Amino acid sequence: MARAEGDSWDVASSVGATAAMVAAGRAVATRDPRGLIDDPYAAPLVRAVGIEFFTKVADGEFDITELDPSSAAEMQARIDEMALRTRFFDDYFLASTAGGIRQVVILASGLDSRAYRLPWPDGTVVYEIDQPAVIDFKTSILAGIGAEPTAERRTVAIDLREDWPAALRVAGFDSAAPTAWCAEGLLIYLPPEAQDLLFDNVTALSAAGSTVATEYVPGILNFDAEKARAASAQMRERGLDLDMPSLVYHGERKHVMEYLTSLGWTMAGLPRTDLFAKHGVPMVAHDNDPLGEIVYVSGTYQNR
């Protein structure tokens, strides 16, 4: 079903289900002996969501490369990318806090468990923003397995299409303190104008020295829905009915690096191929990837 203005979801439906997909990828990467990431909470969260396909992937009962044996190497590269994407944002947060930042905001936090698994410095406050059903689910499941945050975790249960800056302030956010902002895997699910508004708000809330990290997805401009549906069909044959093309907003939008630069941020980009090379992971060309050559971007706010 296509997206609609004001649509909502939980962790097992629509955009919410993509959080389980990403968490399943983190669970697979956590078992990988290369040790690119360590997310002990990914698999328990996926199991709790209850989508059988993702549970089997997370628990190692189904090898995702078997979806299409003719392109097993490409499928492995997709799993590797999930691990490396996670590692990119992990490293970003660790670098930001090493530089003295003690206020963190994770936009559309989904099943992200960084507030529980990263070694945050004393005094760090991590704000998680997402829809109420998603926040409540994750909080309940992690409490149920005895997980405890490694920073002061403050949840902001609100849709990003609503007045989240006001809700963030109510939760105790200090706009006078530098902040590490993260918008991981989010932008393709926002209309172009909402993407701009998101970063307008982030900038308005940022003190000098704040940092930001997100992705630039060039393929969303000329999004190939047929390629995406072909990939969805492979999963549907395994019992997963998730129509990814209907969840994303494609078409022309502003280049996120250029837009943030225009707002006073000093930005840098790391193309996907360079991210793989940085960690010594072989890169297989994604000939059928409808999202194109993703660039991971980060930067620092210079002026207010």
Curated annotation (Swiss-Prot):
Q: Does the keyword Metal-binding apply?
A: no
What's its top-level EC category?
A: transferase
A Pfam family per the record: LCM
Sorted keywords for this record are:
Methyltransferase, S-adenosyl-L-methionine, Transferase
EC number(s) given by UniProt: 2.1.1.-
A Gene Ontology biological process noted in the UniProt record is:
methylation
Residue numbers binding S-adenosyl-L-methionine: 130, 159-160
- Its Gene Ontology molecular function terms? methyltransferase activity
Give the record's family classification: Belongs to the UPF0677 family.
Task: Name it.
Answer: Putative S-adenosyl-L-methionine-dependent methyltransferase Mkms_1059
